[in-house]
């Protein structure tokens, strides 16, 4: 039996959707690690979301750490989690542990643009804010 197939994405069966996500290769897991951009960045670059990277400044939108901000210090594609500085909890023995967040629960406030490919993608995707034409019925 196959362990993963790209065709399972189109299935409506929850078991196949789970199998698709759990057994996906890393290049597919990267597509799951996208986060929304802030309204300012969205307007500037003409994109709604982008893959999250180490060094991006993010704001937590959901959960017990809601409205906290920090920089992404680690991205774990296998588990689909990100780790943000300042978003940590204290264990019973007193040590601090960084809390794992899902990329869908954060919003990117500032982008890390040291990567030339990422910068080129953002610059190339700038869309002019022209009004959409209404279709005739």
What are these regions (language model features)?
Residues 1-52, 125-137:
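Intrinsically disordered, Lys/Arg-rich N-terminal extensions and targeting peptides
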Residues 51, 63-66, 100:
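Residue-level "contact hotspot" at macromolecular interaction interfaces
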Residues 69-125:
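Structured, basic alpha/beta domains of bacterial-type, RNA-associated proteins
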